Amino acid sequence: MKKTGIINSEVSAVVANMGHMDWLSIGDAGMPVPFGTKKIDLAVDKELPSFMDVLNNVLKEMKVQKIYLAEEIKDQNPAQLENIKKALPDVEVAFMPHSELKKSLTKTHAFIRTGEMTPYSNIILESGVTF
């Protein structure tokens, strides 16, 4: 058994298999996942686990060089946007319409579904390198 970091075997395996510039997505309970995209469903109840709990856990093991967020988060969920920026202070942020973010899930290694119940709590993480 792992002592630290991600103990969910599916999430741990996805992160371990990431290469430079690969994408991993984390999102709220309502985000539709395209057919063919691996879905890792961690949601057990409303807000369990929260989006930020899962994001912070993934960030313990994943080097991120860029993130993609829905443009709508700026107006519809500014508190979550601030939480994300605090968790990833030196990472480039790209915004796109929510409809484009949903389409982009087809390019991710997996989508991790949380129990989050706030709008636009979805992110695509672009993997960096550690050297």
From Swiss-Prot:
Subcellular location: Cytoplasm
KW Nucleus (keyword) present: no
Gene Ontology terms: biological process: D-ribose catabolic process
Main EC class the enzyme belongs to: isomerase
GO CC terms of this entry: cytosol
Catalytic center residues: 20 (proton donor)
EC number(s) per entry: 5.4.99.62
UniProt keyword annotation of Cytoplasm present: yes
Annotated InterPro entries: D-ribose_pyranase, RbsD-like_sf, RbsD_FucU
Pathway involvement of the protein, from the record: Carbohydrate metabolism; D-ribose degradation; D-ribose 5-phosphate from beta-D-ribopyranose: step 1/2
UniProt GO molecular function: D-ribose pyranase activity; intramolecular lyase activity; monosaccharide binding
Entries under Pfam families matching the protein: RbsD_FucU
Keyword terms: Carbohydrate metabolism, Cytoplasm, Isomerase
Catalysed transformations (reactions): beta-D-ribopyranose = beta-D-ribofuranose
Binding site for substrate: 28, 98, 120-122
Family statement drawn from the similarity comment of this UniProt entry: Belongs to the RbsD / FucU family. RbsD subfamily.
Function: Catalyzes the interconversion of beta-pyran and beta-furan forms of D-ribose.
Subunit structure and binding partners: Homodecamer.
Name the UniProt record assigns to this protein: D-ribose pyranase
Lineage: Bacteria, Bacillati, Bacillota, Bacilli, Lactobacillales
Gene label: rbsD
